[in-house]
């Protein structure tokens, strides 16, 4: 069983595809679920109801649509947290209440630190024990080929404080070009959202890219981390060379 994590539909201001189109694209790619994480600031209570209802209507025996919201937390440095699960979202009277209920332990969903490579791998102290996961591989910011070296370092450091922490791989998809061959491969089949969330929270999956994969709870030693660091540097060098050989066309 496979699925895609961290997708945005046109419920978000920067999403280009409808939920129906996202599902069609996922099914065409032989995926069994998608975890949608819309920007929370785009929602009021009424829009949240419509969103949850549509996710439910698109879920069937062969495909699960898991709703979520992406929250922007401002402080010393802005971080984004993905809050995932229908039960969590339904129990909030307004979208702004979702984060508080999630992190207080009132709900059974997932809270995942999104794309840490975007914000210098910073995490507020008060989140270290309260989140369930870290997006250690974000295809939009880290490439589809390799996970982020420093995100994995952050994960392994925080897991010493939070033994239930799980690593996730997400697309951060906003349009068709965002389908970057990065998926979650579950160890057990799931028929319902609650069952899928239980397995995700427990880390019963691996993260697979087109050429490399990583367990949801990486505990890498020196050799693997060195290889990843070298691989990231080679990838960066290849991107620079590609840009020099074929620089982007100048706009008229």
Model-derived segments and spans:
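Non-catalytic positions within long, well-ordered alpha-helices that form the structural scaffold/packing
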Residues: 27-30, 104, 127
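Charged catalytic cores and adjacent phosphate/nucleic-acid-binding surfaces used
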Residues: 5, 9-15, 19-20, 24, ...
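Hydrophobic beta-strand scaffold residues
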Residues: 65, 109-111, 167
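Aromatic-lined carbohydrate-recognition surfaces of secreted/lumenal glycan-active proteins
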Residues: 110-120
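Binuclear metal-dependent hydrolase catalytic cores centered on His/Asp/Glu-rich metal-binding motifs
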Residues: 77-110
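An N-terminally biased module of ancient metal coordination in phosphate/nucleic-acid-related enzymes
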Residues: 1-75, 177, 248-251
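Active-site-adjacent beta->alpha loops and helix N-cap segments on the catalytic face
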Residues: 44-51, 93-102, 149
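Conserved beta-strand positions in the central sheet of alpha/beta enzyme cores
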Residues: 35-36, 112, 135
């Amino acid at each position: 069983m496979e699925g895609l994590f961290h997708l945005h539909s046109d419920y978000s201001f920067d999403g280009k595809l409808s939920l129906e189109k996202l599902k069609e694209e996922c099914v065409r790619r032989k995926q069994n679920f998608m975890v949608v994480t819309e920007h929370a600031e785009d929602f009021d209570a009424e829009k949240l109801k419509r969103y949850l209802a549509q996710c439910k209507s698109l879920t069937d025996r062969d495909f699960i649509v898991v709703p979520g919201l992406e929250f922007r937390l401002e402080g010393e440095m802005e971080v984004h947290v993905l809050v995932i699960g229908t039960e969590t979202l339904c129990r909030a009277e307004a979208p702004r209440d979702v984060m508080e209920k999630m992190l207080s332990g009132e709900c059974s969903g997932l809270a995942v630190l999104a794309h840490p490579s975007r914000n210098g791998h910073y995490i507020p102290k008060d989140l270290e024990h309260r989140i369930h996961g870290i997006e250690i591989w974000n295809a939009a910011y880290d490439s589809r080929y390799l996970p982020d070296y420093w995100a994995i370092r952050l994960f392994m450091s925080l897991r010493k404080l939070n033994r239930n922490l799980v690593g996730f791989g997400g697309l951060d998809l906003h349009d068709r070009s965002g389908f970057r061959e990065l998926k979650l491969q579950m160890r057990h089949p799931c028929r319902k959202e609650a069952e899928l969330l239980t397995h995700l929270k427990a880390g019963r999956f691996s993260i697979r890219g087109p050429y490399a994969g990583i367990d949801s709870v990486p505990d890498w030693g020196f050799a693997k981390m060195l290889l990843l660091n070298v691989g990231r540097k080679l990838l960066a060098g290849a991107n620079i060379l590609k840009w020099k050989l074929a620089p982007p066309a100048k706009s008229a």
